[in-house]
Structure formats: structure tokens, C-alpha cells
């Protein structure tokens, strides 16, 4: 083998080592760093104390910079294989995470918050300037579904495309194939989104619900979703989300929606039709559908679905760049127009400006931030929903206290008939009424289902997990994290 081939293979190994260690330092803080194979004879290494998190972070950056240098360009990489832009994207994510972590946790060690944020912005801009990627309006055909005329699915369609390998928004895809590698996302998992999340969607006029005259209230799900950011009906199940059912070649809407019947060429439903949300199918009444496939074959496959996933998505690069530039005090209208507003253009939302109106009912982060940074954080929460970033965002922003908020759902007692999208909500409400608690009429998910219904996030203890006691038993040099003794 040539030295270039060996270096390319080593780049893959070092990328995955960085990937693994990034998860470790987010979870535990200081961890032992190893860069060679160990044997039972390596007593000092096996029983050493934890290495400082900044030292390990430096090694992660070194690994990813090596990967950027030696991995192939995307055009030369095999389908689904690592390439330079994947490494750039991951390093930008790492740098944004610890750049903001250090800022909001008041950590002044090297590399500094400013240095990391600048590096995140530089890496993101390199990907943006490559010209290889764009924000895509998802294909109805590629997702096996068809939208109502006034309710396009340009956002949601991106997440159930059968093939992402040529999709311009996809920096790196996890490629699935029937009978080879499959997953089980097609039907969702019966989980529920929070009312807090539902309230985070802006109205179509670009204003928060507390500021906007377009907001119709939450007495019914119809009212709550009216005049909102179109990503809301593409993330939270409702009558505006049509499904293509492959049985008999028919396209059939959510069952029980009389005012949308014209969409169906037949009054006879197909098999396994997806219904609009009922109270027993989700913990909160807000049922997530972002990754749920409309394809009959994918629905029938259950645990053997084969549509591709995004590993790294171009939208994240734009959000990294916007947030890093804002944190650096360098976020101009030009920055917003090439980042946040590209995401909004996809769903035909009003543009964000550098001087947005402050939310009259803002999320309490425990400290003050500018209205611009607040809106960039909101955009990230909405755009990257269910892509694995929210918990870590709260940790790096030093606002873990948000986890202590009550987990509320819809208001079923105000919406039994109006909200009865599938003919089940009325009886569902009666059957679950005795098993649920309520706050201001909204479902309180944990009130009667847990001994300690409200999570107890303790600052600063819970920003790190405990070191497993069995590991400390094996190696007494592994000291426990603060507050966990």
C-alpha cells in the first residue's frame, strides 16, 4: 500500500476515535486518553487517573484535523464513506459545543471560547464556500407522499427520502438497504413532544406567539397550529399531514378529516393507514412525525425500514455558522441571509433580521441574551428537532435548569370534539383522565406516573454524569465527579 492509502485509513480510525472521545468528555468531563493498544502489562496506563478535558479536547481536534487532511474529497469517496467535509462538519460541531460551553460555564482555559468559536465559524464557512451543498425542498416522490396544495412538505420530505446519497443537503448519509442494513423509524415510537416545544414555533408573520395577532390560542389543535411556521405541521402530527398509502395504488389522507376528503381519489381507505393523533398514541398529544415514513412498504416493514438517514446535514453547518458569528459579535444581515434565512426560505417563512422583536414570553435560560441570539437558538431547536442536539445544547448553554420544567401536553378537556381528528380523542380522554394529572388544563405527563414527577437537575452536578462505581472499584485513581460522591 502507498503511504497515502495508509494515511487515509488512519484518518478514518482517528475520526472515529475523536467521535467516541467527544461523547465521553461531554458525558464525564475528564477521561483517560489512550492512543495505543494496551496489554495487561501496561499497568501504569491501565490504572492511571483521568486526563484533563482540555487535553483530550486538544487530541480530538488533532484527530479531526488529520482526518480533514487525509480523507478523500466527497467526490472521490465511496457512497456513505467518510470524506473531508464530514470531518470539517464534525470538528465545527465540536468547536461550537466547547466554545459556547466555556463561555457560559465561565471556563477560561486554553483553547479559549473565542478561539473555538472562531474555528467553528471558519470550518463552517469552508463547507459553505465549497458550493457542493444547498438547502433542498424535499421531493414528494422520493418520500412516497403528496401534500395538500396549501400545506407543502418541503421540510418533512427530506427525512424520509429513500436515497440521500445524491441529495445536496446531505453531507454524509447513513445508507440503508433492505436485507442488508435496516432500521425501525417508519412508524415512530409513540413518544410525545412537549407543549414548551409546540410554543416555540413562530407565527407566519415571523413573530413569537406572545407577540403575534395571528396566534389563535390552544383550545384546539387546529387553532394552535393555524398561522404557524410550516415546520410545525411537518413535525407534529395533525390533519395537515397527508400520507401516501400504497395499497391498491391509492393516496389516502388521515382518516376522519372531512374537509380534506378531496385529496383522496377514493372514499375507501387503504390498509395500515396512518391516523391523526389520538391521546393513547402519544404521551402528550403532540405526536412527532418528522422521521415517520408515508410509504406503505416502509410502514409494513416495521423494524426493517430502509430509507436513508442524515449523519451530517448542511442545515447544521448553517446553524453553526450563524450561532458562532453571533457569539463572536459578527452576525450581520448578510450572515443571516446565507444561513437562517435559507432555512426559512425552504418553508416560506418571513426572514430573520439583525434586530428582531424580543419575545414577550421568553424561555428562561437563567441569564439574559440578545433577541438575535435568542432567535438563532429558537431556529436551531426547530430545525434540528429529533436529530440529537437539544440535550447537548442545553448543557453547553449552561441552562440545564430547563429540564426541571413540567412536561406538559395538549389541553384535551378543551378539545375533545374540535380536536377529535380520528374519532378517538373523546373516548381516549375519558379512559386516561384518571391516570393523568393536569396543569392549567394541559396534560402533565409525569404527575401520576412517577414517584418523583419533576426532574431534579442540580447545577453544577448534573452537567456531568457520575463515573460508574464499578469502574472506580477497578481503578481507584478514577475520582468521582463533583456532587456524585
Task: Outline where the language-model segments fall.
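C-terminal/domain-terminus segments
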Residues: 186-204
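Acidic/polar-rich alpha-helix caps and helix-coil junctions
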Residues: 2-189, 207-485
Amino acid at each position: 500500500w502507498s503511504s497515502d492509502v495508509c494515511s487515509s485509513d488512519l484518518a478514518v480510525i482517528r475520526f472515529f476515535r475523536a467521535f467516541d472521545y467527544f461523547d465521553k468528555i461531554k458525558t464525564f468531563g475528564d477521561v483517560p486518553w489512550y492512543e495505543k493498544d494496551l496489554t495487561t502489562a501496561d499497568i501504569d496506563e491501565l490504572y492511571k487517573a483521568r486526563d484533563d478535558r482540555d487535553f483530550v479536547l486538544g487530541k480530538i481536534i488533532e484527530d479531526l484535523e488529520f482526518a480533514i487532511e487525509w480523507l478523500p474529497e466527497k467526490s472521490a469517496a465511496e457512497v456513505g464513506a467518510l470524506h473531508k467535509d464530514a470531518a470539517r462538519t464534525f470538528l465545527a460541531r465540536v468547536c461550537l459545543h466547547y466554545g459556547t460551553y466555556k463561555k457560559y460555564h465561565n471556563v477560561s482555559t486554553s483553547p479559549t471560547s473565542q478561539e473555538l468559536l472562531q474555528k467553528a465559524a471558519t470550518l463552517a464557512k469552508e463547507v459553505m464556500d465549497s458550493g457542493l451543498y444547498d438547502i433542498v425542498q424535499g421531493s414528494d416522490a422520493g418520500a412516497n407522499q403528496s401534500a395538500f396544495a396549501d400545506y407543502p412538505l418541503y421540510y418533512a420530505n427530506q427525512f424520509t427520502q429513500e436515497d440521500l446519497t445524491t441529495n445536496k443537503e446531505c453531507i454524509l448519509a447513513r445508507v440503508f438497504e433492505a436485507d442488508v442494513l435496516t432500521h425501525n423509524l417508519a412508524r415512530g415510537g409513540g413518544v410525545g413532544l412537549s407543549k414548551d416545544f409546540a410554543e416555540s414555533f413562530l407565527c407566519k408573520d415571523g413573530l413569537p406567539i406572545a407577540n403575534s395577532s395571528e396566534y389563535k390560542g390552544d383550545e384546539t389543535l387546529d387553532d394552535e397550529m393555524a398561522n404557524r411556521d410550516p415546520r410545525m405541521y411537518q413535525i407534529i402530527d395533525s390533519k395537515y399531514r397527508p400520507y401516501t398509502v400504497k395499497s391498491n395504488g391509492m393516496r389516502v389522507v388521515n382518516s376522519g378529516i372531512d374537509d380534506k376528503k378531496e385529496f383522496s381519489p377514493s372514499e375507501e381507505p387503504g390498509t395500515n393507514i396512518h391516523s391523526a393523533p389520538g391521546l393513547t398514541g402519544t404521551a402528550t398529544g403532540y405526536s412527532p412525525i418528522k422521521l415517520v415514513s408515508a410509504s406503505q412498504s416502509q410502514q409494513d416493514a416495521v423494524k426493517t425500514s430502509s430509507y436513508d438517514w442524515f449523519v451530517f446535514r448542511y442545515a447544521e453547518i448553517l446553524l453553526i455558522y450563524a450561532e458562532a458569528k453571533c457569539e463572536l459579535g459578527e452576525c450581520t444581515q448578510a450572515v443571516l441571509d446565507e444561513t437562517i434565512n435559507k432555512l426559512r426560505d425552504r418553508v416560506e417563512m418571513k426572514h430573520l433580521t439583525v434586530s428582531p422583536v424580543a419575545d414577550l414570553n421568553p424561555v428562561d435560560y437563567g441569564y439574559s441574551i440578545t433577541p438575535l441570539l435568542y432567535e438563532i437558538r429558537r431556529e436551531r431547536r426547530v430545525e434540528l428537532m429529533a436529530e440529537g442536539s437539544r440535550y447537548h445544547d442545553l448543557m453547553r448553554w449552561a441552562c440545564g435548569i430547563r429540564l426541571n420544567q413540567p412536561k406538559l401536553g395538549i389541553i384535551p378537556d378543551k378539545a375533545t370534539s374540535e380536536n377529535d381528528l380520528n374519532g378517538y380523542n373523546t373516548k381516549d380522554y375519558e379512559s386516561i383522565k384518571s391516570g393523568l394529572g393536569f396543569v392549567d388544563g394541559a396534560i402533565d405527563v409525569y404527575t401520576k406516573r412517577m414517584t418523583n414527577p419533576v426532574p431534579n437537575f442540580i447545577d453544577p452536578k448534573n452537567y456531568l454524569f457520575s463515573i460508574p462505581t464499578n469502574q472506580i472499584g477497578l481503578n481507584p485513581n478514577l475520582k468521582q465527579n463533583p456532587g456524585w460522591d
